[in-house]
UniProtKB/Swiss-Prot annotation:
Disulfide bonds: none annotated. Present with 12400 molecules/cell in log phase SD medium. The lineage of its organism: Eukaryota, Fungi, Dikarya, Ascomycota, Saccharomycotina. Acts as a regulatory subunit of the 26S proteasome which is involved in the ATP-dependent degradation of ubiquitinated proteins. Keywords: Proteasome. Belongs to the proteasome subunit S11 family. One of its GO terms (biological process) is ubiquitin-dependent protein catabolic process. Pfam families: PCI (PF01399), PSD13_N (PF22037), Rpn9_C (PF18261). It comes from Saccharomyces cerevisiae (strain ATCC 204508 / S288c) (Baker's yeast). Coiled coil: none annotated. SUPFAM superfamilies: Winged helix' DNA-binding domain (SSF46785). This is 26S proteasome regulatory subunit RPN9. Residues 187-355 form the PCI domain. Transmembrane segments: none annotated. GO terms for cellular component: cytosol; nucleus; proteasome complex; proteasome regulatory particle, lid subcomplex; proteasome storage granule.
């Protein structure tokens, strides 16, 4: 550990270059370091690294100050400070070196640790570093190394009973980035939702980052061939970033139209907007098949009957009657519904529909159906009572 005079010199030099609003933090650094108040020092460092005005000085503070007592403060906080320092770096090889060096330092500390000396190992810090190393490989476009590291990391995480949220969040975030690179819409969608579910309250995401993620999730929901339930996404607060933006609000409307099987609205949006996003334009035929499937499901839901004619399905989905059988078979193969097809009489009998998160309008329709069902049961009860009076007498 450096002596106090050297630390004072380092901090004084950095303080002179820092934004005036950060000067009180440097005074705290000096005071807490001298008094060995590591927890308080860590809290002050967190404030510094979370402040956007600290960006130009982050790496130098990490190199010249934090690295001198990394073994005294929370291991995940040390990794967080390093990641904040490297956030805007385009030198990915340098970033890998920093991450590898810190990992080696943690491993060295653990190798020297005496059994039962009360100190905690640095396994959590190493796991977080591995996840961020995989992310850096992705940024270098080395997808093979990234995938290998993520697969090894997943095996390790699966064996653990308890994992800090910061680690699982980093793992899901890096994994979702990998799936985005691979255009794996299904995996990206579900992994990104897991990422959002593990976000700590203290984690700050910029508006631009939230909007980009909402956009990417919307595209994946539309193009994923195994994604037919959008309720969780539509109700997530992150979607507010595109609902309130005139450039992207149509994506939200498009997903809503899919959810409720509104063929006409979906068709009108596609005709006007699809050319704005080339990847959607490339998959237009798939999108039209998807709205037909969702319209079929909604037709079953709304009509509240188990038997539908080919004619009913044809009208709802705007498909020729000859294509109805194929559509129903496709829905059954995807696990969206269960039933049987009577080709001779052109009837489809539905026995089960996949559970899904439904909208407020759909809940209202369900309530109306329950009220109607209750009325019918009540009428039947009164009729049976009237006809059975002579028997009871």
């Amino acid at each position: 550990m450096f002596n106090n005079h050297e630390i004072d010199t380092i901090l004084s030099t950095l303080r002179m270059e820092a934004d005036p609003s950060l000067h009180p933090l440097f005074e705290q650094f000096e005071k807490f370091y001298e008094e060995k108040l590591w927890f308080q020092l860590s809290e002050s460092l967190t404030k510094f690294f979370d402040d956007a005005k600290s960006t130009p000085l982050r790496l130098r503070l990490y190199d010249n100050f934090v690295s001198k007592f990394y073994d005294k403060i929370n291991q995940l906080s040390v990794v967080k400070y390093l990641l904040a320092s490297l956030k805007d770096s385009k030198d990915f090889d340098e970033s890998l070196k920093y991450l590898d060096d810190l990992k080696a330092q943690f491993q060295e500390l653990d190798s020297k640790k005496q059994r039962n000396n009360g100190s905690k190992d640095h396994g959590d810090g190493i796991l977080l570093i591995d996840s961020e190393i995989a992310r850096t490989y992705l940024l270098k476009n080395d997808l093979v190394k990234a995938r290998d590291l993520l697969d090894d990391l997943e095996k390790t995480l699966d064996k653990k009973d308890s994992i800090p949220l910061r680690i699982t969040n980093s793992f899901y975030s890096t994994n979702s980035q990998y799936f985005k690179f691979k255009n794996d819409f299904n995996s990206f969608y579900y992994t990104s939702l897991l990422y959002l579910s593990t976000l700590e309250p203290s984690t700050s995401i910029t508006l631009a980052e939230r909007q980009q993620l909402a956009y990417d999730l919307s595209i994946s929901a539309l193009l994923g061939d195994k994604i037919y339930n959008f309720g969780e996404l539509l109700h997530h607060p992150i979607m507010e970033t595109i609902v309130n933006d005139s450039n992207y609000d149509w994506l939200f409307q498009l997903l809503n139209a899919l959810t409720v099987g509104d063929f006409d609205k979906f068709d009108s949006l596609i005709k006007v907007q699809i050319s704005k996003i080339p990847i959607l334009a490339q998959h237009e035929s798939f999108l039209r098949q998807k709205i037909c499937l969702m319209t079929l499901i909604e037709t079953v839901f709304v009509k509240n009957i188990r038997m539908l004619s080919f004619e009913d399905i044809s009208k709802a989905t705007h498909l020729p009657k000859d294509n109805v059988e194929h559509l129903v078979m496709r829905a059954i193969s995807l696990g969206l519904l269960k039933g049987s097809i009577d080709q001779v009489n052109e009837l489809v009998t539905i026995s089960w529909v996949q559970p899904r998160i439904i909208s407020g309008d759909q809940i209202t329709k369900m309530k109306d159906r329950l009220v109607e069902w209750n009325d019918q049961v009540e009428k039947l009860g009164k009729k049976m009572e009237a006809r059975g009076q002579s028997i009871w007498v």
